[in-house]
From Swiss-Prot:
It holds the Pfam family AAA_2. One of its GO terms (cellular component) is HslUV protease complex. ATP-dependent specificity component of the Clp protease. It directs the protease to specific substrates. Can perform chaperone functions in the absence of ClpP. ATP binds at P116, T117, G118, S119, G120, K121, T122, L123. The lineage of its organism: Bacteria, Bacillati, Bacillota, Clostridia, Eubacteriales. Keywords: ATP-binding, Chaperone, Metal-binding, Nucleotide-binding, Zinc. Zn(2+) binds at C12, C15, C34, C37. This is ATP-dependent Clp protease ATP-binding subunit ClpX. GO terms for biological process: cell division; proteolysis involved in protein catabolic process. SUPFAM superfamilies: Glucocorticoid receptor-like (DNA-binding domain), P-loop containing nucleoside triphosphate hydrolases.
């Protein structure tokens, strides 16, 4: 302050206090600010920042609204939708809860989705994130390994979330992470092994702290950590983790536990096909997951178990035509862009569903079946202008030959037009 005139009384430009009344006065171009005003401004900014980082409960959909939204995109699985809706709603209420009021701290409840392949586990998680307008990241558990081994570190899961939040850490800390194929990191045997299981139990151990809530150090460019790089610090306490897996073989563990064996007259003989896999999974308990290969600590950090049912023929047919982004609607739109109408007969939809069940791919296999059926005709349509309608019937699913409705002008005119068009655009002498 020596460069200023001592005789001139300096005052804070905001509160008007003189330099004798405050501890420190900071000078700017023609203005001054005291330490008290700096502290006050800092408190205002901090309060506003904390308000912005909270999820507005008034705008947060109620559980019934969440389920109704899921109904638009996911067919069936009503019990799973209800469980997810309640869990997600409670999770974001927990984020906004004030521990200082009554000293009651709400613990985080991550979700474990169990269901056969193609039952809608991934779609449910994606649809939830879209509704809530929060950052969402998907990860594949099969690529994860314990730190120090070839593969991805578990922290790379958090990096995907940070990237999807445009590197807004506070926004990412309220996001949702879906870890698929979580059953693939089960340890190889029920009993602990003396050999190191770097892609099974080792990954489960590495995920424990992140699932529970910790301040994780994430490499900004991904990959392996090394001591000379800077890290992004992110608190996972308010990140909702949804883990999903098909858990092939878990049904046999449940069946073995629940099967009642009796001898002599009056014994009940149960066939293996008596219960659907989805029905068996509903009876799963933590003990079954332990025998499957998940460690107790990992099971404890996924307290909410949601079971999805296998999809039958009627459910798959509804999936084909009812959702807002149904496959039938998608392919109709694709052909309409070439001015061609597409019609799926009901028997064709049932045949597609039957083939998906036979392949044991669930809803995930529906697109590949339609793609195989439509491939040749979608190849021909842009070149053959006489096709105005394509009809997919039951026989089409078997022989891959759709029924075509042609224009009344005949087949020769489009070929002539097409030939002239090709010559004009491809002949180097006329170009």
């Amino acid at each position: 302050m020596s460069k200023y005139d001592d005789k001139k009384q300096l005052k804070c430009s905001f509160c008007g206090k003189s330099q004798e009344q405050v501890k420190r006065l900071i000078a700017g171009p023609g203005v001054y600010i005291c330490d008290e005003c700096i502290d006050l401004c800092s408190e205002i900014i901090t309060d506003e920042f904390e308000e912005n980082t909270q999820v507005d409960l008034s705008s947060l959909p109620k559980p019934s609204e969440i389920k109704n939204y899921l109904d638009d995109y996911v067919i069936g699985q009503d019990s799973a939708k209800k469980a997810l809706a309640v869990a997600v709603y409670n999770h974001y209420k927990r984020i906004n809860s004030d521990v200082d009021v009554d000293d009651v701290e709400l613990q985080k409840s991550n979700i474990l989705l169990l269901g056969p392949t193609g039952s809608g586990k991934t779609l449910l998680a994606q649809t939830l994130a879209r509704l809530l307008n929060v950052p969402f990241a998907m990860a594949d558990a099969t690529t994860l390994t314990e730190a120090g081994y070839v593969g991805e570190d578990v922290e790379n899961i958090l990096l995907k979330l940070i990237q999807n939040a445009d590197y807004d850490i506070e926004k990412a800390e309220r996001g949702i992470i879906y870890i698929d194929e979580i059953d693939k990191i089960a340890r190889k045997s029920e009993n602990p092994s003396i050999t190191r299981d770097v892609s099974g139990e080792g990954v489960q151990q590495a995920l424990l702290k992140i699932l529970e809530g910790t301040v994780a150090s994430v490499p900004p460019q991904g990959g392996r950590k090394h001591p000379h790089q800077e890290f992004i610090q992110i608190n996972t306490s308010n990140i909702l983790f949804i883990c999903g897996g098909a858990f092939d073989g878990l049904d046999k563990i449940i069946e073995k536990r629940t099967r009642k064996s009796s001898l002599g007259f009056g014994s009940t003989v149960q066939s293996k096909e008596e219960k659907d896999i989805g029905e068996l999974l509903k009876e799963s308990v933590p003990e079954d997951l332990l025998k499957f290969g998940l460690i107790p600590e990992f099971i404890g950090r996924l307290p909410i178990m949601v079971t999805l049912q296998s999809l039958d023929n009627s459910a798959l047919v509804r999936i084909l035509k009812e959702p807002k982004n149904a496959l039938v609607k998608q392919y109709k739109k694709l052909l309409l862009m070439d001015n061609v109408e597409l019609e799926f007969e009901d028997e064709a939809l049932k045949a597609i569903a039957d083939e998906a069940i036979e392949r044991k791919t669930g809803a995930r296999g529906l697109r590949s079946i339609i793609e195989e059926t439509m491939r040749d005709i979608m190849f021909d349509i842009p070149s053959q202008f006489n096709i105005k309608k394509v009809i997919i019937n039951k026989d089409t699913i078997k022989n891959k030959k759709p029924e075509l409705v042609l224009t009344e002008d005949g087949e020769d005119r489009p070929e002539i037009v097409q030939t002239k068009h090709k010559r004009k655009s491809m002949d180097p002498e006329t170009a």
